[in-house]
Amino acid sequence: MINAIRTPDQRFSNLDQYPFSPNYLDDLPGYPGLRAHYLDEGNSDAEDVFLCLHGEPTWSYLYRKMIPVFAESGARVIAPDFFGFGKSDKPVDEEDYTFEFHRNFLLALIERLDLRNITLVVQDWGGFLGLTLPMADPSRFKRLIIMNACLMTDPVTQPAFSAFVTQPADGFTAWKYDLVTPSDLRLDQFMKRWAPTLTEAEASAYAAPFPDTSYQAGVRKFPKMVAQRDQACIDISTEAISFWQNDWNGQTFMAIGMKDKLLGPDVMYPMKALINGCPEPLEIADAGHFVQEFGEQVAREALKHFAETE
């Protein structure tokens, strides 16, 4: 049994711009004793489903500006919190967090909720993991919205990931340092540094799931998993590259936060070349790493693109 802790509910009281009702699963196969949280908004009987995957060090709060737009279109919107994040349980041992631990959770969630006609919405680790999902069951996936994300493979052979891991010191090196080094990580301060457009209330909401460092094992582990990729991650991600190049026939929309020092245009344009049929991206000049902070614009532009090209 995995040793995990649960963020007290009162930490999530009266969060700014987060009026959504919680949903939980506590019996997913392979995760005994762990309770997972997800949002389930919009029309529960809709044919189309938007599956919105957050990254590091965020949670479903990241999609607060996109969920209403997707829901207004008549679709169902699912936004899970990875284990270690948001309202989901948080294993306290960093060793419990692996690429397959997170990926298999997403696959189990999709199967349990029987999600179909999925528009996959990804950014950061939501992309590292999410971009490996469609090849597992392509019939479930219909469209892709990708924002500042890539696949973690071999940087020698893949330009997108190479651009990510070979950045100047103010890129991934600084990001990892800010998350891994502090003995008392203040995630509200971290978010304000990397997303300066945030209000104090928004930054505090991002930090709500993490009352102290004992809740932050998942946050600390993600950057280490980039620096030291396990073989399963490399193998699965390499297989996914072939899928997106050769087998993907769905609609795609790409948005790039142009100020991102991690997964900005140097990463995203090689990703565009990798994804079959990917159109010219929406470049958002003022957006950094957390593109979803400009999410209403991205969501509306994506829906418009899908309607015009369907």
Swiss-Prot record:
What pH dependence of activity is documented?
Optimum pH is 8.2.
Q: Which SUPFAM superfamilies match?
A: alpha/beta-Hydrolases
Question: What EC designation does it have?
Answer: 3.8.1.5
> What name has this protein been given in UniProt?
Haloalkane dehalogenase
Cite the InterPro entries for this sequence.
Answer: AB_hydrolase_1, AB_hydrolase_fold, Epox_hydrolase-like, Haloalkane_dehalogenase, Haloalkane_dehalogenase_1
Q: What is the reaction catalyzed?
A: 1-haloalkane + H2O = a halide anion + a primary alcohol + H(+); 1,2-dichloroethane + H2O = 2-chloroethanol + chloride + H(+)
Which GO biological process annotations does it have? 1,2-dichloroethane catabolic process; response to toxic substance
> What would be an example GO MF term here?
haloalkane dehalogenase activity
Q: Which gene encodes it?
A: dhlA
Q: Which Pfam families match?
A: Abhydrolase_1
